[in-house]
């Protein structure tokens, strides 16, 4: 029987540790960790994600500061807010909820976030530290995936790993993390020739292409580990029902694999949990506290 990599279960276990970490240090810091989330516009999915982050913060004892800005605001005003939050000592972590409306210069806004508060790990300084394998903020979804693999003692070193997708959020940073952990990494994308053949050579196959049900059993070798990063809401042909699925046709793949992540309940919960880890790590760093979280930051 295939092993389910239960991200929801692992995330709750890590959250318990985070809660205890905050409780044991709050007397010396005199304040909880603080996370600022900047949301621009009315993208409905962003609203759900921000609410999930707010709830997760509350569960472990992080104080969240939500800045919901109308899309009529201009670039300069958002930049001013980021600069203000950079100087706010009650804010340990900050993120720009993506996507944002096209009129904004997304990369410039991210580059303005203090690298020590960049809990999404997207600032170029943190990307550079990842490239050089130096300590720094790590992108949440890739870090969550590494922790899922480690939780079940799945070996990364020396394994053939194929990442389908090259986004700055997942594909690129994840490939670098796995390379730093001595995996033999191949990164593929929409222009890759013979994708199926390449995928079938993988000991660990990670689907982060953003295409529903792209990967079926013909892409996967027997005994592989498959990580599904995608999440999509599909509507039935008569529009009477919707269901969530990932980039992997799981019911087709599960009989062949050693381990897999479900959708939902796999990678998603770990992404939010790693955001909490990064925020608390920044808080501990500011107060020069002994951190027990470094093993969670690949």
Curated annotation (Swiss-Prot):
Binding-site residues for NADP(+), renumbered to this chain: 165-167, 190, 231
Highest taxon above the source species: Bacteria
Pathway: One-carbon metabolism; tetrahydrofolate interconversion
GO cellular component term of the entry, any: cytosol
GO BP term, pick one: L-histidine biosynthetic process
Molecular functions per Gene Ontology: methenyltetrahydrofolate cyclohydrolase activity; methylenetetrahydrofolate dehydrogenase (NADP+) activity
Keyword Lipoprotein: no
Catalysed reaction, written as an equation: (6R)-5,10-methylene-5,6,7,8-tetrahydrofolate + NADP(+) = (6R)-5,10-methenyltetrahydrofolate + NADPH; (6R)-5,10-methenyltetrahydrofolate + H2O = (6R)-10-formyltetrahydrofolate + H(+)
PROSITE patterns given in the database record: THF_DHG_CYH_2
EC number: 1.5.1.5, 3.5.4.9
Keyword Nucleotide-binding: no
InterPro entries assigned to the protein according to its UniProt record, in alphabetical order: Aminoacid_DH-like_N_sf (IPR046346), NAD(P)-bd_dom_sf (IPR036291), THF_DH/CycHdrlase (IPR000672), THF_DH/CycHdrlase_cat_dom (IPR020630), THF_DH/CycHdrlase_CS (IPR020867), THF_DH/CycHdrlase_NAD-bd_dom (IPR020631)
Keywords: Amino-acid biosynthesis, Histidine biosynthesis, Hydrolase, Methionine biosynthesis, Multifunctional enzyme, NADP, One-carbon metabolism, Oxidoreductase, Purine biosynthesis
Family: Belongs to the tetrahydrofolate dehydrogenase/cyclohydrolase family.
HAMAP family reported in the protein's UniProt record: THF_DHG_CYH (MF_01576)
Protein role: Catalyzes the oxidation of 5,10-methylenetetrahydrofolate to 5,10-methenyltetrahydrofolate and then the hydrolysis of 5,10-methenyltetrahydrofolate to 10-formyltetrahydrofolate.
Quaternary data: Homodimer.
Record protein name field: Bifunctional protein FolD
Organism of provenance: Prochlorococcus marinus (strain MIT 9515)
């Amino acid at each position: 029987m295939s092993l389910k990599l239960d991200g929801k279960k692992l995330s709750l276990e890590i959250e318990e540790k985070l809660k205890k970490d905050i409780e044991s240090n709050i007397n010396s810091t005199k304040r909880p960790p603080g996370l600022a989330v900047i949301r621009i516009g009315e993208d409905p999915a962003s609203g759900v994600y921000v609410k999930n982050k707010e709830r997760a913060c509350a569960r472990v004892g992080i104080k969240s500061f939500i800045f919901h800005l109308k899309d009529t605001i201009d670039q300069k005003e958002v930049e001013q807010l980021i600069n203000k939050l950079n100087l706010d000592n009650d804010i340990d972590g900050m993120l720009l909820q993506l996507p944002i409306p096209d009129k904004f210069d997304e990369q410039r806004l991210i580059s303005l976030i203090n690298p020590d508060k960049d809990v999404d790990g997207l600032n170029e300084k943190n990307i550079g530290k990842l490239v050089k394998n130096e300590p720094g903020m790590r992108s949440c979804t890739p870090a969550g995936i590494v922790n899922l693999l480690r939780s079940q003692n799945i070996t990364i070193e020396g394994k053939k790993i194929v990442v389908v997708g090259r986004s700055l959020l997942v594909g690129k940073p994840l490939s670098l993390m796995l390379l730093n952990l001595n995996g033999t990494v191949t990164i593929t994308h929409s222009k890759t020739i013979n994708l199926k053949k390449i995928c079938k050579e993988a000991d660990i196959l990670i689907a982060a292409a953003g295409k529903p049900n792209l990967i079926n059993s013909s892409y996967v070798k027997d005994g592989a580990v498959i990580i599904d990063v995608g999440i999509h809401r599909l509507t039935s042909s008569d529009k009477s029902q919707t269901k969530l699925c990932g980039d992997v046709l799981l019911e087709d793949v599960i009989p062949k694999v050693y381990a897999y992540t479900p959708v939902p309940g796999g990678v998603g919960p770990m992404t939010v949990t790693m955001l909490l880890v990064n925020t608390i790590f920044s808080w501990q760093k500011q107060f020069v506290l002994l951190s027990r979280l470094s093993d969670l930051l690949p």
